[in-house]
Curated annotation (Swiss-Prot):
Disulfide bonds join C46-C112, C54-C105, C96-C132, C121-C160, C125-C149. Glycans are attached at N60, N284. Residues 189-505 form the Peptidase M14 domain. One of its GO terms (cellular component) is extracellular space. GO terms for molecular function: metallocarboxypeptidase activity; zinc ion binding. This is Carboxypeptidase Z. It is found in: Secreted, Extracellular space, Extracellular matrix. The active site is at E475 (proton donor/acceptor). Its EC number is 3.4.17.-. Inhibited by 2-mercaptomethyl-3-guanidinoethylthiopropanoic acid (MGTA) and guanidinoethylmercaptosuccinic acid (GEMSA). Inhibited by chelating agents such as EDTA and EGTA. Zn(2+) binds at H251, E254, H383.
């Protein structure tokens, strides 16, 4: 055939690529002619480890050349293997991270100690491959060659080390607990980062049918932002099941929320297994995401000062000295500008390109990508330093930015959400003179954020103006870093408010928007007359609209369809969302019958330095499988690596 020379040339090129991609035999071929396994240890010159992706490895020194024959930091950082480690948490939706990343680091930057390099243990690799292979299969990605458990990892008898020992570290206190403790036992103590990750992973393993952990990104110093999720089908969005998140430790020195969310995770797991009907109903009808520590780097600084320290600033910022609750895009100023113009939408406001010119923390980026990926309905951010629940807006509409009551269009609903927490909190309702934060008692321990003090760049305002999510801020107490003996009391005071708040996600209405053929309509608008704030449908056409009791006129519309209007009545004591579906009819050739609004959909301005724009932060499992001969969706992450693209990740 005429193409035979071309095929031979292509095969030769692929063979050359394979030789370049895989390290040579070490120390040499055995008598049978096969490649001998790498030695478990060998002499080397140890150098300091300088890889940001591997900054949280359990060792500080490595050596060159590496098992992949990289001979400099530049070669490692330019390699597709290193690029893969940096994006694994996005590709796998946080599954198996940071475990897989640290396993990869043990090959790309081998441990060097006392003039000898050491190989990681094969059993660790095999255990991770068994657990994580389904995650790779789900996105049609081959298992990375450099994580070959036979070639790059050593058996126990040859001497090896556990590359995940950092995750298993600092467990002496947990392991020393007496055996035979009841499954409901919770240790009310402060948790280091390693202990926190371990507790979350243990909890997810214990309740694997309803829980899993994942990472949404990494802090500036490389710590994974670990989330534990609870759902009847963990890892996937279910039709009309609302999504809710709780975030702690956005300020590193405000630690009560961090610990309370660790306790809450254990409580939900234990009570579910014990058959608590309230918890089982909650987990079977709600997808709950708990992020105990948004600022683990700041926590380390605060923890070094010790519990009880109340200096108000030590560890507050992240490692870049950025206040994360002032680091989000200021969409509130844009809202005030748009609100003065009739017929212009004031919801789902895009992020200005100017925002990316400033200093944006990796923790902030991780949160923004997270809430653009999952259709969150409700959220709370847990803080410390006072005893009050505040709600948006946090930025004042006063022309001189002074504190001033600045309500959102959903003022009534936000007050209901805030009261759902405060009204069942014993200390927030305490009328004694010794009560912390007593100046809020006359307000019912709730306040509009801007009426308290005004600031821009807050996370709550961003949630409301950029997405469908309603977020409140909970100040848990006047001591930012309470001593351990106070933690049990804090948990008891906040357990019922947290559960009551989580259940509030089932207030209002929910439903599905479809066309006349039953096909879901994505990004349809759900409008409520008298409330100038729309929500949009998720990819499956489902929506949730938090609403206070009363009568409402609800409208659904989408480009190319006629609008549909319905009147709904929400009873005062109704504790579950009413079902309101819409079937949209396609428009004819006449004038388009839309409600007043912008002439085009608001664009979503993405981080120009972040993930490829075509991915749009959708969950990997939502991607279509590639057509025959085309590349999978995740290939876009590696397009800049030509000619060294990781073709070894392709299955076909």
């Amino acid at each position: 055939m005429p193409t035979t020379p071309l095929l031979l040339a292509a095969l030769a090129a692929l063979a050359a690529l394979a030789v370049a991609a895989y390290p040579s035999c070490s120390p040499g071929p055995d008598p049978s002619g096969k490649c001998q396994r790498l030695a478990s240890t060998h002499s080397a010159t140890c150098v300091d480890l300088h890889l940001r992706t591997c900054a949280d490895a359990a060792y500080n020194h490595t050596s060159f050349p590496t098992p992949l024959e990289h001979r400099s930091w530049e070669a490692v950082e330019a390699s597709p293997e290193y690029t893969l480690l940096g994006v694994l948490h996005f590709l796998l939706e946080g599954q198996c991270n940071p475990d897989l990343r640290l396993l990869g680091c043990s090959v790309l930057a081998p441990r060097c100690q006392g003039g000898h390099t050491q190989r990681p243990c094969r059993r660790v690799c095999e255990g991770l491959r068994e657990a994580c292979q389904p995650a790779f299969d789900a996105i049609d990605m081959a298992w990375p060659y450099f994580l070959d458990c036979t070639q790059y990892f050593a058996p126990e008898e040859e001497g090896c080390y556990d590359p995940l020992e950092q995750l298993r570290g600092e467990l002496d206190v947990e392991e020393a607990l007496p055996s035979g403790l009841p499954p409901t036992f919770i240790r009310f103590a402060h948790h280091s980062y390693a202990q926190m990750v371990r507790v979350l992973k243990r909890t997810a393993a214990r309740c694997s049918q309803v829980a899993k952990t994942y990472s949404i990104g990494r802090s500036f110093e490389g710590k994974d932002l670990v989330v534990i999720e609870f759902s009847s089908r963990p890892g996937q969005h279910e039709l009309m099941e609302p999504e809710v998140k709780l975030i702690g430790n956005i300020h590193g020195n405000e630690v009560a929320g961090r610990e309370i969310l660790i306790y809450l995770a254990q409580y939900l797991c234990s009570e579910y297994l014990l058959g608590n009907p309230r918890i089982q109903r909650l987990l079977n009808t709600t997808r709950i995401h708990l992020l105990p520590s948004m600022n683990p780097d700041g926590y380390e600084v605060a923890a070094a000062e010790g519990a009880g320290y109340n200096g108000w600033t030590s560890g507050r910022q992240n490692a870049q000295n950025l206040d994360l609750n002032r680091n989000f895009p200021d969409l509130t100023s844009e809202y005030y500008r748009l609100a003065s113009t009739r017929g212009v939408r004031t919801d789902h406001i895009p992020i200005s390109q100017y925002y990316w010119w400033g200093k944006v923390a990796p923790e902030t980026k991780a949160i923004m990508k997270w809430i653009q990926t999952i259709p969150f309905v409700l959220s709370a951010s847990l803080h410390g330093g006072d005893l009050v629940v505040s709600y948006p807006f946090d930025f004042s509409k006063h022309p001189h930015e002074e504190k001033m009551f600045s309500p959102t269009p959903d003022e009534k609903m936000f007050k209901l959400l805030a009261r759902a927490y405060a009204d069942v909190h014993p200390m927030m309702m305490d009328r004694s003179e010794n009560r912390c934060g007593g100046n809020f008692l006359k307000r019912g321990s709730i306040i509009n954020g801007a009426d308290w003090y005004s600031f821009t760049g807050g996370m709550s305002d961003f949630n409301y103006l950029h997405t469908n999510c309603f977020e409140i801020t909970v100040e848990l107490g006047c001591v930012k870093f309470p001593p351990e003996e106070a933690l049990y009391g804090l948990w008891q005071h906040n357990k019922e408010p947290l559960l009551n708040f989580l259940e509030m996600v089932h207030r209002g209405i929910k439903g599905v928007v479809t066309d006349k053929y039953g096909k879901p309509v994505k990004n349809a608008r759900i409008l409520v007359k008298g409330i100038r704030h729309d929500v949009t449908t998720a990819p499956d056409g489902d929506y949730w609209r938090l609403l206070p009791p009363g009568s409402h006129i609800v409208i659904a519309q989408a480009p190319g369809y006629s609008k549909v209007m319905k009147r709904v009545t929400i009873p005062l004591r109704m504790k579950r969302a009413g079902r309101v579906d819409f079937i949209l009819q396609p428009l004819g050739t006449g004038p388009k019958n839309f409600l007043p609004g912008p002439s085009r959909a608001l664009p979503r301005s993405l981080d120009p330095q972040g993930a490829p724009a075509q991915l749009d932060f959708e969950p990997p499992r939502a991607r279509r499988q590639p057509a025959s001969g085309s590349k999978p969706w995740w290939w876009a992450y590696f397009t800049s690596l030509s000619p060294h693209k990781p073709r070894w990740l392709l299955k076909y």
